[in-house]
């Protein structure tokens, strides 16, 4: 259905372009998108009627609300002079990178018609961010020169203001310009270390447009923003996943450990489980002690008897000799 509607709008646009001259713009389109969820900003989209031009004060209020949450590491303000809402229909296929970044964002809103904005708006918003979001550095880049941007790897917050050249009026040249600027945007955003970026894309320098463009019911990337509106305020880039904690079974050792470091023989459970074995060990031990006792005693007695006999054998000749001497003494006295 969206595809058919696009073709019908292109046919209607072609008929107007062939028959009408261009006139100065009285309003400009605008897009906000942020990688992280920006709470409270979606109500500006819900309250917006694309048939009516959004007042400048309401736009600035929405921009400050969008930036004041301070949920980004880099704030990118893109000024595309001469941008008109018809470009998003006629050159939709050239906005490849822009659409991809909007699609992956958590918050995205768009306004097809906004009152003409001050040319110094981005500098005012940069001061607002510096004051409320603790940002020190502001980088100003020419949108047609990649050499202006020096890649950085630190974690300091920054404001980047991209000033594209004014779009040409020729259709083919305008198409080529959008393709080139889209690639430039991809080059810059891809080199920013953190994906947490808040981006505002609009025109601060109005150009020309069709006299009856306001009556053409053009929407900015309806395939993307219709989904964003239906989803509502949902964080789509939450790095910390909200998942239940993993549950693990209690640790159980493969083999049950003993109740203490040392096994005691007085453990009642040990005695009960090994009663027969303990009785056998005790009987053998007692028998061994008795055998050792009686065998040792018999050996001692035998040794004493042997020693006594040896002593008797050794002393008998001496006693005999002494007796003979005693007997000789009386006989000598008689003579």
Curated annotation (Swiss-Prot):
Residues 1-17 form the signal peptide. It comes from the Eukaryota. The chain crosses the membrane at residues 276-296. It is a single-pass type I membrane protein. GO terms for cellular component: endoplasmic reticulum; endoplasmic reticulum membrane. One of its GO terms (biological process) is cell wall organization. Residues 20-275 are lumenal. Residues 297-335 are cytoplasmic. Keywords: Cell wall biogenesis/degradation, Endoplasmic reticulum, Glycoprotein, Membrane, Signal, Transmembrane, Transmembrane helix. InterPro entries: Big1. Disulfide bonds: none annotated. Its main location: endoplasmic reticulum. It is found in: Endoplasmic reticulum membrane. Glycans are attached at residues 24, 144. The keyword Membrane applies. N-glycosylated. Present with 3460 molecules/cell in log phase SD medium. Required for normal beta-1,6-glucan synthesis. Belongs to the BIG1 family. This is Protein BIG1. It comes from Saccharomyces cerevisiae (strain ATCC 204508 / S288c) (Baker's yeast).
């Amino acid at each position: 259905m969206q595809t058919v509607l696009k073709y019908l709008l292109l046919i209607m646009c072609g008929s107007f372009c062939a028959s009408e001259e261009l006139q100065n713009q009285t309003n400009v389109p605008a897009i906000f998108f942020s990688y992280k969820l920006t709470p409270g900003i979606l109500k500006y989209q819900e309250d917006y009627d694309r048939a009516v031009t959004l007042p400048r004060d309401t736009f600035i209020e929405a921009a400050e609300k969008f930036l004041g949450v301070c949920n980004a590491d880099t704030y990118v303000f893109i000024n595309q002079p001469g941008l008109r809402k018809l470009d998003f229909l006629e050159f939709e296929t050239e906005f490849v990178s822009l659409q991809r970044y909007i699609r992956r964002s958590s918050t995205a809103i768009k306004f097809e018609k906004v009152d003409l904005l001050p040319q110094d708006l981005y500098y005012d918003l940069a001061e607002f961010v510096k004051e409320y979001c603790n940002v020190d550095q502001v980088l100003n880049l020419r949108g047609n020169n990649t050499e202006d941007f020096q890649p950085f790897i630190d974690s300091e917050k920054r404001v980047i203001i991209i000033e594209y050249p004014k779009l040409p009026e020729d259709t083919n040249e305008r198409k080529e310009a959008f393709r080139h600027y889209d690639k430039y945007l991809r080059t810059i955003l891809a080199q920013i270390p953190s994906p947490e970026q808040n981006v505002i894309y609009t025109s601060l320098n109005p150009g020309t447009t069709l006299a009856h463009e306001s009556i053409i019911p053009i929407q900015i990337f309806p395939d993307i923003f219709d989904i964003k509106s239906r989803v509502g305020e949902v964080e789509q880039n939450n790095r910390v996943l909200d998942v239940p904690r993993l549950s693990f079974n209690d640790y159980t050792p493969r083999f049950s450990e003993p109740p203490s470091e040392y096994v005691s023989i007085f453990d009642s459970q040990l005695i009960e489980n090994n009663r027969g074995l303990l009785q056998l060990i005790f009987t053998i031990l007692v028998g061994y002690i008795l055998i050792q006792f009686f065998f040792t005693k018999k050996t001692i007695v035998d040794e004493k008897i042997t020693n006594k006999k040896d002593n008797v054998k050794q002393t008998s000749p001496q006693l005999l000799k002494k007796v003979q001497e005693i007997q000789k003494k009386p006989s000598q006295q008689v003579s």
